[in-house]
């Protein structure tokens, strides 16, 4: 027990000694650290002082440099402003010198003008004196002339005016004739080039149309079936289609006759289907005719759409499309009107291209120009007026309407588009073989043309040539002068336009010739 107590005291003593030693060591260490920190702080303060001194010196140097730089810039700017002021001063001095010179020049001119005015006033006074003297002399001479010529001055003036007026009229007539001749030559040359180019580029095919249709039969026995009991089938066909069915001695064929090609086409298709079907009686005839009529209407519409597409004319009203398609079954002097309209559209477009005009508009006017022929048998009036009315009604432009209305009337053609349509219409109709007319009508038209020319005084002979498209008139040189011949030509043209109806245009040529003959003995 005692040993443990001793050990415990010893242990406590050792611990106390260790604590004392540790405290002493810690105290000494703290003192060393404090001394080290103080030394470091002193060192930092010294370095900071040195750095502050360096910064201060640098700041002073920088400030001095900036001051020097600002001083240099100020001196430079001052020198530049001084140079500008010197230049401005020189310009001002130069302007002052110029102004002084101009003032001196103006003063000299004013002096010269004053001198000139004085001279002019002096000359004016001299001229007035001479004018008065001349007036007195003219009056004296005038009195002497009136006494010698036994005529007053007013009468002499009237005679002189009449003479000058007659001479002026002669000169004016000669000038007008020369201008017209030059214009006609140039216009004829240019129009021939354009027309020749258009015709060379477009040559449409054409087959003459007939006013009858022939339906072939498988045998002659079919004629009896077509006639029917007591002719009832023929009467039913004629009543349903509006055509004349002719059954004659022609073997294995019957003839359909009608002035209306659409009716004739309906009758032809209907009869062919009846022959193929074999059932020919009034009830069946009516059914077939109704179906065929609807099919023909559809064909007309398709034809109009196809033609407008082929020609390149779009956005046409459906009613005008139907009228255009129906022209397939119309003829004019045996020429198919639809093919004629296509020809006119192409020719008009080509001539418009040569003249730098709107090609689409020209083709449109050419294609629709004869649209009135589709309904002219139903409505009173000329086909041109009817066509223009329909075109206006269904939304065509005013230029198109005018071209349609005036394509057969020179007097109303006041637009270049109308002239082109008229020229293309004449070209298409005037081609050899394009149209045919009855000999009696042809001869009558030529006689009327020659009678109009012979009705004027001074006409010796006249000849209608080129199928009535030109008339040549011979006049005597002793009866008419050149100016009278020109006026005669214009009068004949006006009378032909007012009294005759003709396609295209008629050229009137007046020939005045002088013949001199003598005999060698």
From Swiss-Prot:
It comes from the Bacteria. Residues 211-277 form the KH domain. It comes from Syntrophus aciditrophicus (strain SB). Residues 337-430 form the HD domain. Keywords: Cell membrane, Endonuclease, Hydrolase, Membrane, Nuclease, RNA-binding, Transmembrane, Transmembrane helix. Pfam families: HD, KH_1, RNase_Y_N. GO terms for cellular component: plasma membrane. Coiled coil: none annotated. The chain crosses the membrane at residues 5-25. It is found in: Cell membrane. The keyword Transmembrane applies. Its main location: membrane. Its EC number is 3.1.-.-. Endoribonuclease that initiates mRNA decay. This is Ribonuclease Y. GO terms for biological process: mRNA catabolic process. InterPro entries: HD/PDEase_dom (IPR003607), HD_domain (IPR006674), HDIG_dom (IPR006675), KH_dom (IPR004087), KH_dom_type_1 (IPR004088), KH_dom_type_1_sf (IPR036612), Ribonuclease_Y (IPR017705), RNase_Y_N (IPR022711). HAMAP family: RNase_Y. GO terms for molecular function: RNA binding; RNA endonuclease activity. Belongs to the RNase Y family.
């Amino acid at each position: 027990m005692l040993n443990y107590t001793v050990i415990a005291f010893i242990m406590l003593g050792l611990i106390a000694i260790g604590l004392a030693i540790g405290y002493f060591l810690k105290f000494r260490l703290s003192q060393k650290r404090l001394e080290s920190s103080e030394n470091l702080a002193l060192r930092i303060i010294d370095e900071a002082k040195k750095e502050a001194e360096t910064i201060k010196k640098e700041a002073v140097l920088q400030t001095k440099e900036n001051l020097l730089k600002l001083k240099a810039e100020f001196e430079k700017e001052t020198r530049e402003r001084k140079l500008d002021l010197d230049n401005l001063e020189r310009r001002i001095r130069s302007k002052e010198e110029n102004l002084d010179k101009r003032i001196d020049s103006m003063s000299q001119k004013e002096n010269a003008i004053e001198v000139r005015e004085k001279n002019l006033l002096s000359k004016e006074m001299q001229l007035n004196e001479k004018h008065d003297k001349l007036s007195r002399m003219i009056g004296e001479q005038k009195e002497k002339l009136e006494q010698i010529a036994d005529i007053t001055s007013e009468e002499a003036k009237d005679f002189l005016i009449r003479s000058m007026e007659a001479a002026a009229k002669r000169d004016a007539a000669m000038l007008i004739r020369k201008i017209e001749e030059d214009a006609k030559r140039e216009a004829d040359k240019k129009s021939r080039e354009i027309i020749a180019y258009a015709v060379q580029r477009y040559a449409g095919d054409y087959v003459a149309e007939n006013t009858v249709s022939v339906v072939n039969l498988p045998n002659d026995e079919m004629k009896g079936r077509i006639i029917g009991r007591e002719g009832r089938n023929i009467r039913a066909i004629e009543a349903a289609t509006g055509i004349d069915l002719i059954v004659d001695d022609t073997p294995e064929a019957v003839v359909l006759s009608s002035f209306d090609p659409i009716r004739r086409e309906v009758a032809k298709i209907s009869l062919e289907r009846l022959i193929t079907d074999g059932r020919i009686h009034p009830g069946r005839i009516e059914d077939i005719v109704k179906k065929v009529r609807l099919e023909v209407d559809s064909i007309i519409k398709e034809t109009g759409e196809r033609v407008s597409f082929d020609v390149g004319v779009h956005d046409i009203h459906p009613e005008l499309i139907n009228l255009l398609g129906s022209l397939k079954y119309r003829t004019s002097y045996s020429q198919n009107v639809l093919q004629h309209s296509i020809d006119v559209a192409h020719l008009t477009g080509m001539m418009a291209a040569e003249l730098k005009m709107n090609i689409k508009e020209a083709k449109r006017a050419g294609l629709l120009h004869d649209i009135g022929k589709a309904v002219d048998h139903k409505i009173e009036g000329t086909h041109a007026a009817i066509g223009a009315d329909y075109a206006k009604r269904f939304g065509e432009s005013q230029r198109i309407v005018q071209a349609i209305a005036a394509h057969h009337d020179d007097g109303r053609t006041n637009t270049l588009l109308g002239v082109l349509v008229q020229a293309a219409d004449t070209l298409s109709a005037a081609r050899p073989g394009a149209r045919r007319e009855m000999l009696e009508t042809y001869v009558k038209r030529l006689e009327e043309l020659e009678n109009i020319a012979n009705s004027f005084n001074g006409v010796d002979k006249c000849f209608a040539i080129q199928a009535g498209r030109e008339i040549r008139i011979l006049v005597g040189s002793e009866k008419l002068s050149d100016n009278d011949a020109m006026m005669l030509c214009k009068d004949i043209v006006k009378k032909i336009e007012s009294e005759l109806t003709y396609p295209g245009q008629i050229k009137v040529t007046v020939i005045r010739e002088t013949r001199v003959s003598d005999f060698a003995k």
